[in-house]
Amino acid sequence: MVETVNTLRREAFSKLNAVRNIKKNQIEGYFSERFGDIQVLSGNRHVVQALEAINRAFVTEGGSGQTGWTQAVAEFGPWLEQYGKEYGYYDLFLISRNGDVVYTVAKEKDLGENLIKGSLATSGLGRMFNKALTTSVLVFILHSRLLREI
């Protein structure tokens, strides 16, 4: 009887370990794909041009919603929106080196905020942005409920 229980226990732990390894591989694969997405986006000439044009208008006009900003968003926004839809992202951000959120696909209240000295400086997004400024390592930001916990 004891031997049967021990055998069943070993089999159960073996199955649990197998499931754990499968899940681990799935999670690692998911994050590997997301890092690949980031590398493609960050090196994409279109994204670089979008950030430059939208940021230039944002700085020149003192924020979002003005004519130059709207024109830049009309030019580059559809491509960014399509990219987000294709890859299942809820939102994509363009953030200047100064910490200004100059564009978001979702255009929520974080648009126009500053991640260094604004109300979002202590948010998960603000902390991750500040961490990205101080490291040469690629920082991956999850925009989700988990972000609020970081």
What kind of feature is each model-predicted range?
Residues 1-74, 81-90, 97, 138-140:
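Juxtamembrane extracytoplasmic/periplasmic/luminal helical "stalk" adjacent to the first N-terminal
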